[in-house]
Each structure stands twice: as structure tokens, then as C-alpha cells.
Amino acid sequence: MTASHHPGNHEQISRREAMRRGVCGAAGMIAAGSVASRVLAAPAEKTPEQVAAELKKTRDEAAKAKAKAKKVQTKSVIQVFLWGGMSHNDTWDPKPGTGYDYLGEFDKFIPTNVNGIQLGALLPNLAKQADKYSLIRSMTHGNNGHETAAYLMQTGHLPGGRLAYPAVGAIFTFFKKDQYKGLLPPYVVMLEAAGRFSEEGFLGPAYKPFATGGDPNAPRFEVQGIVNRGIDDGRQKARRELVDKVNLFGYGLADVPEMAAAETARQNAYGLILGKGREVFNLESEPTELRDRYGRNTFGQECLAARRMVEAGVPYITISFPGGWDTHSNHFATMRNQCASLDQGLATLLGDLKDRGLLESTLVWCTGEFGRTPKVSWEPPWNGGRHHHGDVFTVLVAGGGFVGGRVVGSSDEKGEKVKERPVYPADLLGSMYLLAGIDASAKLPHPWGLDAYVLDTENEGMKAAGLLEELM
């Protein structure tokens, strides 16, 4: 299931053989110049860089052929963002036998419903759904800073310069804007944007995600800054009518892009509260048993709300996991608490999407900006913590054209470095764009008229090892 390549496996030439060939070559020049020319012009052994480039090209071509053959494209994306960086060794990429300094308290591992795939014991529900998702165990970018790593994972571009590139959600919104005619905003974040993972970048405010605020686990979904606690619908409608009457200044500047974007945002907000779009967030209409299965907590109900948004056709939904994963200290207690709701909510979401026939056209991906150090820091002030680790970590992908039940790549015996088949941000995002019918080489409108593309690894010096043809 893993793709491996060993650039050192070329024909080995001994010193004696090299000397023999040199003598024969010299004799050939005397005897027949044309033959000597052909010998001297023979291609040299390929460098590791050349081998890697050829392998990338092969993967890219295979992925494009497989994506073209698929009957269904990605229509919606649900991104579960684990801000802070979740430990890969304790969850998706367990390392039995590495000892207490690496395992700590989490020395139990469980099989999944797919032969050969094992998870940490913190994820029992997701272990039963492994046939629905695949794991990329060789994700890497090598950066250990929160903001920079999040930017890499969300844009596929190197940070730097005066303008930020748009995140993947903004890219989806830009390319799907003519196809989506729903009442809800096309790019929704629950509950708040965290860090640089949902930027509109230089595309402008029209592609900024709508952050819902509030709490879908509460009896009434409240949009921060628009609906205040205790204000009923009648009063809210009266407020809107009053604003419309006195907004003469705004109407006079309707052609100004910034004012038009602000008005669009305001109308979107009212659509959530007073229009049919509000019903999407009325989770009380769901069966009690199903709500319980998702988990009666914020993350579980976010997952349920995300499924309802998919049914409404929203192109891109981000769930920013409530509470962080930045476990420099108190790691083991935090992981137990966080993984309980992650395991329940995400497993139920995948099963629910599958049962409703939505998983094939809905791409789900779950990751933080990086993983965490495999070796535990027991000394003060950490007292059992794991730190930032961008050298290798794991990403879960499901649906939207990705097949389930597979593992791509591997980390080394302790989960510290990539062992086989590195996957870089551009490889992951490029694969997602491909499955959604988005041309990753397409040019984007830049406010300064500069050349800017969805992805541009060669000109930026970004690493790439090839699209994820193994999962298509």
C-alpha cells in the first residue's frame, strides 16, 4: 500500500569493470571513431534528483488519468483543522516497542477494520471506519512554527512577501462561485478562524470565510455580532429594515468593491439568521439518537452541522477543533480529553456521509499544521510533553474521489523522519484540486498584476514528490 523508491538501486560498476571499459573505449577510438563517439555520448547514470523528478512526473500523470476516469468530482470539502498540531504517534501512526520515553502512557494499540492498519487506542470508533478513509503517514514540510506551518498546509506556498496567498477554501470558493447558488456563504468556518489557515489572501474580502461564532451545541445557533442573546426574530427583522432605510451612503457606493463585499457579508449573515439558510443550523430537527451519536459537545455538533451544510451544497466548510492540540505540557491528559470527542464526532460524520450517499462527492481531510515530537519531554517545565514536529506527521483523507482503507508512505521506526514516499503540501493540495476539477496551474488575479498561480512549486522552490495517485 505504500509507494517506495530507492534511488540508490542502480547498476553498480566495479573499479575493475570501469578500467576495462575505459581501455576498451580508448581502443575503440583508434579503431573506429564513430563507435567511440557513441560510447562517449552514452547517457550517464541518473542523479537522485533526476530519478525523483521522473517519479513525480509518473505519479502526476497517473493521478490525472485516474481522476479523469472518475464519474463524480468533489462537490464539497469538510476540513477538520487540529490547530496546534496533534501527535501522530499517539493516534494515526503508532510505534509499538519504542519504549516509555516515546510511548509514555499510551502503550496500547488497536486493529482497524482494514487488515494491516493499526491505530492508537485513543481512536476506537475511527478504527471501525478505516475502510472509509486513508492515511498519509509521510506528510512533511519541515517547519516547526505554528503560523508558517499552517500557511504552508493551507496554501501550498512559501510564506514571504507583502501579500498572502489565498487558502485552499478561498481557492475552492473562487473556482466554484459560478456553480454554487445556495443561500449560505460558500466558505464557512465553525466557529472561528484560528491562525493563518482560512485566509482569503490577495483574492480579497469576497472570498473571506464566514465565521459563524456561537455554538451549534446550544439550543439556538447565534451568529456573533449579528444576533444577540435575547433578541427575537421580529426585533431582528425590524432592525434590518431600519438599516436598509438609512443605508443611503452604502447604496451610493455600491460599485466600490469594498462596500459591495461588506454588503454581501451583511446579507449572508441575515440569510443565516432570518432566511432558509438558518434551517441548516437548526440541529433540533435531527433525531435525538443521531445527535447523541455525534456527541453532545461542540465538536460533535459542528460535525453534524457540517453534514447539513454539505446537503445544502456549501462548497467548503472548515471545522476548527475547539481547544488546542499544542501539548508542550499536560500532553497525556489533554490527548485523552480531545481524542474522545474527535474520535466520536469524526467517525460518526464519515459513517453518516457514507450512509446518505454523500461521501463519494464530499472530501474530508483532517490534520493540524504539523505533528508532535515522538520523544516525550519528561523534564520540568514540560513534565510529559510533546513539541512541534514538521519533519513527518499524518493526514487523514476520505471521500471526494479518494479511496479508503489505504496508507501512503511511512515514517521511520520512531516516527521522527519520513522513511518512504514523502508527501509535501503541494502534493496534497494539488491532489484535492485535481479531484475537484480545479487546474492547479491556473493563474489567479493578482492586485498588482503579478503572475500568481494556484500552485507554483517550480518557480517558488517548493518541494513536491507527486500527486496522490495511490489514493485515486
Can you describe what each PLM-predicted range is?
Residues 1-472:
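Ligand-binding pockets and gating/stacking loops
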